[in-house]
């Protein structure tokens, strides 16, 4: 079998969750961090397909958990983007680089805050020192994303409170100089405005 065929077999095993085939490829000396055309490694593919046993085995075998594909995905960012708490709990103990950026320049907590992934946000704040005031490429913090890019409902209110309780700065503005409080009021998100006021906004 050629090296390319071995890589193809290895990546397919990760996609399908075939742990025995995965181990066999590793035993044959496949490059554990080999990628497909999208620059996806086996651990990225396994993460996207919720093949948790393969993710665990690849971490134990020394896979690079921080390597990112063409769309900036890696296992940690996938867990934050897709609300995959199981994956997050597998990846966090392996010590992922929390400063790796999504394609929009956010850190993991940024899309999780935007999308209303309450449990992911809670876990990140409890277990990591991820930067809650990180500003992405369009000038938004996780707090601003949680307000502007969703519906202001119960999940978003909970995320705003979690962020504020864990050091999010209620005064950091967007690139046009608008504060979280102004933006919440513009959108008619009264409950979020109250949370911001209570935090000193």
Where are these regions (language model features)?
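Ankyrin repeat domain, specifically the short helix-to-loop turn at the C-terminus of the second helix
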Residues: 23-31, 56-64, 89-97, 122-131, ...
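A generic tandem-repeat structural signature
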Residues: 56, 60-114
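Intrinsically disordered, low-complexity regulatory segments in ankyrin-centric signaling systems
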Residues: 1-28, 37-40, 198
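Ankyrin-repeat-protein effector appendages
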Residues: 1-9, 148, 165-166, 175-178, ...
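Ankyrin repeat A-helix N-terminal signature
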Residues: 12-17, 45-51, 78-84, 111-117, ...
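Conserved ankyrin/ankyrin-like repeat signature
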Residues: 21, 54, 86-87, 119-120, ...
